[in-house]
Design a protein with these regions (language model features):
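N-terminal helix-turn-helix DNA-binding module of bacterial transcription factors
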Residues: 1-61, 342-348, 355-378
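Periplasmic-binding protein-like
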Residues: 127-133, 189-193, 223-225, 245-257, ...
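Hinge/beta->alpha junction and helix N-cap segments in small-molecule ligand-binding domains
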Residues: 71, 79-88, 106-114, 166-176, ...
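Alpha-helical recognition/docking segments in bacterial nutrient-uptake
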Residues: 61-179, 247
Length: 378
């Protein structure tokens, strides 16, 4: 088994320096830190003897690495995806580990900048396996971790090959929502509030939008705004749209998650824009606050608690059978129709979303025109 002494010897540094690098301490030169990390990667070193523990002294602990996103308007955005999304994930994970009488160790990594590899290496030495949230660790780092211990990515990219992935069928869910706007409400002009560039969920939802626009030439994207999956960034997107309202004038605002959709609704309410009479607003995720807003939010339900359950089950299977080949599990979504899209007040309709045929969004029939045209905000 590779030891801390082996790393120190090959890197040409003291064992104390290796320890400081592994634990993310600051008193190490950048060049030295880089050299030590390269040797750690080359040797496949796992701190704290975790590699031996996997085969001989199982700890019965798994780790969960969550994504922490901070809004530019608030140092601590209490409405961020980190809380509302991961609360349900945690409930699902906890239900499985409690059944197996295991324990859970939780940490948060900030999305900005490179992943904190020393911190992840240190965490890997304390657990039997890792659950990693939604794209916070790039594939090259993920491959390194997966060589050291079992790893499952929650809400990761369906194209991921370095580790197991459990995620919702985001493309199918987004395609169903967009078809509803076009076919049932006559939406032609769409404004998109996108999620973080690094978030696989946002990438899949964006792909569904691009495919739909390509298949439906009568529709057009009149503008877009990059958000952070937070209410504050959604409100900023709404303000951006209001500033170009006369030129953009969309039929519908398509948001990559519910928090941002709520932020857009807040911006519109302040400006006197009536939803859905002047413009439709839709989200994704089906978080509880969306159902309480006025108007209640049309969205796509992704089974967040089930994501946690299935990811935990897969990780425990991989810990027991390390030779399992990585696989991607897509969980089905549900279209949740309320009144923010233009459905009658009081509507609460749920429609299961089938997988996309041939992996692509299907073209729609020519949409009916919206009966009430959008007007400038007061």
């Amino acid at each position: 088994m590779v030891t801390l002494y082996d790393v120190a010897r090959i890197a040409g540094v003291s064992t104390a320096t290796v320890s400081r690098v592994v634990h993310g301490q600051d008193k190490v030169r950048d060049s030295t830190r880089t050299r030590v990390l390269e040797v750690i990667d080359q040797l496949g070193y796992v701190p704290d003897g975790a590699a031996q523990s996997l085969s001989r002294r199982r700890k019965n602990i798994i780790g969960l690495v969550c994504v922490e996103r901070q809004s530019p308007r608030q140092q601590y955005d209490i409405e961020s995806m980190s809380l509302l999304f991961y609360d349900e994930i945690l409930r699902g994970v906890e239900s499985r580990i409690r059944h197996h009488k295991w324990s859970l160790l939780i940490t948060y990594l900030e999305e900005a900048g490179d992943p904190d590899l020393p911190r992840l290496l240190s965490l890997s030495g304390q657990v039997d396996g890792l659950l990693i949230g939604e794209g916070i660790v790039p594939s090259e780092y993920l491959a390194r971790l997966a060589k050291r211990l079992p790893v499952v990515v929650i809400a990761g990219s369906p194209a991921e090959r370095a580790a197991d992935v459990v995620t919702a069928d985001n493309r199918a869910g987004s395609a169903a929502l967009l078809r509803h706007l076009i076919e049932d409400h006559g939406s032609r002009r769409l404004f998109h509030v996108d999620g973080p560039i690094t978030a696989p969920d946002a990438r899949e939802r964006r792909l569904a939008l691009n495919e739909l626009l390509a298949a439906n030439p009568h529709c057009q994207l009149v503008g877009s705004s990059q958000g952070l999956f937070s209410v504050a960034s959604g409100e900023e997107a709404g303000e951006k749209l209001l500033a170009i309202w006369d030129e953009a004038r969309p039929d519908a605002v398509v948001c990559a998650n519910d928090q941002m959709a709520i932020g857009v609704l807040q911006a519109f309410a302040k400006a006197g824009v009536a939803v859905p009479e002047q413009v439709a607003v839709v989200g994704f995720d089906d978080i509880f606050p969306g159902s309480l807003y006025d108007p209640p939010l049309t969205t796509v339900h992704q089974p967040m608690r089930l994501l946690g359950e299935r990811a935990c089950t897969r990780l425990l299977d991989r810990i027991a059978r390390p030779a399992l080949r990585p696989k991607v599990e897509l969980l089905p979504t549900e279209l949740v129709l309320r009144s923010s899209c233009g459905c009658p007040p009081g509507t609460v309709t749920r429609r299961p979303v089938p997988p996309l045929r041939a992996g692509r969004s299907e073209p729609s029939a020519a949409p009916r025109r919206r009966r009430t045209p959008p007007v400038s905000p007061s």
